[in-house]
A protein has these predicted regions:
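Conserved beta-strand/loop scaffold segments within soluble protein domains that form the structured core
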Residues: 1-167
Length: 168
């Protein structure tokens, strides 16, 4: 999606049924004074798989807020990969809830900022059942007077054991 100026809002609801597999690539392109606000809501059925990519590039002036809200049923797999570059102000926010456990989540991202750009990646993964897995790797490159922020929250109730969470 690209525009010269103004607000560009989108909201998508995606239901991936039991045992289904899907690959999704979202591309956000920002030019001029455009303000992007995007929400993707996903429900993954049991044993469903979603490979989700976000490529967000801008000219240094536009702003971006992109949120992914994902619910995972048992034995589902969600893989999220993002590359964000060139936004004056940008925020990517994947939020995942493993509803009854036994799900696998992979979050990987790269944020590239220059000049006075400010980019933030805020992730949240909530384990609401046992035997969940998380693999997370977030990287950033910042030059000039730019800033990049990563904030990763993992919510694990004390009663659940056998969780594997790796965050870098």
């Amino acid at each position: 999606m690209a525009a010269a100026s103004g607000l560009i809002p989108t909201r998508v609801l995606l239901v991936v049924e039991e045992k289904a597999q899907l690959e999704l690539l979202q591309v956000f392109s920002g030019r001029g004074d455009a303000a992007h606000s995007h929400l993707l809501e996903v429900h993954l059925g049991q044993e469903a798989q979603l490979n989700h990519g976000v490529l967000a590039c801008a000219d240094g002036v536009a702003s971006l807020f992109a949120q992914c809200a994902v619910e995972q049923e048992p034995r589902s797999t969600y893989t999220f990969t993002s590359v964000v570059q060139g936004w004056s102000l940008g925020r990517i926010e994947p939020r995942v809830i493993q509803v009854d456990g036994q799900a696998s989540t992979t979050l990987k991202g790269l944020a590239v900022a220059d000049a006075e750009q400010q980019l933030a990646v805020h992730t949240s993964v909530c384990f609401e059942g046992p035997d969940g897995e998380l693999d997370q790797l977030q990287k950033c490159l910042a030059a000039g007077r730019s800033h990049t922020i990563f904030n990763g929250a993992i919510n694990v109730p004390v009663s659940y054991t056998h969780l594997r969470a790796h965050e870098t």
